[in-house]
Amino acid sequence: MGRIISYCNISTDADNLVGLYHSLGMGYPKFFKMDSLSRAGLVAAEIVLQKAGLRNDDPKPDMSVVLVNRSSSTCNDVEFQKSLAPDNYFPSPSLFVYTLSNIVCGEIAIRNRILGETSFFVQEDFSPEFMAEAIGWAFADKAIKYVLCGWVECQKGRQSCMMALVENDGRAIEPETLESLYK
């Protein structure tokens, strides 16, 4: 069930991600409070939705979000763990909230007024078969016409994303199509 409307691939460090944010004219100050995973997902979603001609202030009750990665929220978990150090025990609530990997889905949904279901899965590696199946699960809800999906990873200061907007055209999305976007 699906036709790719738009997609992007990003592989960058935190500084370049901020540059992308500025070049997109996002004007979303909350971006600077987010963890790296959420920043990467938000920028990738912005690129994909802008390419598709969708405005972030229009409600999207017919769209869902499906994201996958390998490391869950490990990047931010490490930072949060540092705030628990015995000699400096001041856990940061702003770090804690991002120790949940599905927060990136919520950030994307809030920014873009996506009102459908959001799902985040952790897989050992990118699996186009799993992604195609998860897109199918989202389209099982007859109200959903679009799925914003992707692989969003953050490890060792690098963020990488493959994000795509899939439209339900009544045919199954081929795993090979998703694989070609990931490369």
Language-model-detected regions and their locations in the chain:
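Conserved "HGTGT" condensation-loop signature of ketosynthase/thiolase-family condensing enzymes
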Residues: M1-I144, L148-K183
